[in-house]
Design a protein with these regions (language model features):
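Solvent-exposed loop/turn segments flanking beta-strands in beta-repeat/beta-sandwich domains
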Residues: 11-24, 113-124
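Aromatic/hydrophobic beta-strand junction motif of beta-rich domains
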Residues: 6-10, 108-112, 205-206
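Short, solvent-exposed loop/linker segments at the N-terminal edge
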Residues: 1-3, 98-104, 195-202
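Short, solvent-exposed loop/turn segments at the edges of extracellular beta-sandwich modules
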Residues: 69-74, 165-170
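Flexible, low-complexity linkers/stalks enriched in Thr/Pro that connect modular domains
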Residues: 53, 70, 80-92, 149, ...
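Surface-exposed, short loops/turns at beta-strand junctions within beta-sandwich domains
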Residues: 55-60, 151-156
């Protein structure tokens, strides 16, 4: 994603020039190739050939072609295939909802999608550092993302965080939500009458 630095070598004892080209697709036709910054007459040895501004093209599979020409017109060609992905992962957290009261084992429900999704991480914290719930890997993660065991946690307000990372090196997508943990049972008491008390209407004789 972003500006891709293309590193390589374009030299010869009788070097003339090199041309770096790109095209959408893995098997392009000859006339489809587009130059990246034009022809260069300066030899390069294990250094930057060109910068490819990938944000100027659509996401997808692209072919790169380096053509090095010498003084007598001989040409050496090298090709590479890459995947451009400038679209961050899309994250939807369906449950628990914001400020929902939860207890015991909580199902974290949602959908994370991306063409090149690498992993989804789920974290929680009450304060301080984030603690991991789980890490899920796959191209698309949906429905039950994780199960969060709150049984041993103190009651109170917590934050949940989903972090989705793709394989293109761009910043991850994060989503944070506040929930309230309540594992304390309600109090219930009948103060009067006492258990097994005999009760009835009071009759006054006169």
């Amino acid at each position: 994603s972003g500006n891709l630095k293309i590193v390589g070598t374009a030299t010869d004892s009788y070097f003339d020039s090199y041309l770096l080209q790109q095209v959408n697709g893995a098997n392009p036709e000859e006339g489809d190739w587009q130059p990246i910054e034009g022809v260069s007459a300066t030899p390069v040895n294990s250094s930057t050939l060109r910068q490819f501004a990938t944000t100027t093209v659509a996401d997808g599979i692209y072919s790169l072609r380096l053509r090095v020409t010498d003084k007598v017109g001989q040409i050496t060609t090298v090709r590479r295939t890459i995947t451009i992905d400038n679209t961050p992962p899309k994250v939807t957290l369906q449950s628990p909802t914001q400020n929902q009261v939860v207890s015991q084992t909580v199902g974290i429900m949602g959908v994370v999608s991306d063409a090149n999704l690498e992993q989804v991480q789920v974290f929680f914290r009450r304060s301080g550092n984030w603690r991991s719930v789980t890490t899920v890997r796959g191209s698309t993660v949906s429905d039950r993302l994780a199960e969060w065991d709150t049984a041993r946690l103190a009651d109170g307000e917590y934050q949940l965080k989903l972090v989705a990372t793709d394989g293109s090196g761009q910043p991850p997508t994060e989503l944070t939500r506040t929930v309230i943990v309540d594992n304390t049972l309600p109090q219930a008491e009948i103060a009067s009458p006492r258990n097994d008390d005999q009760v009835g209407q009071v009759v006054v004789l006169s």
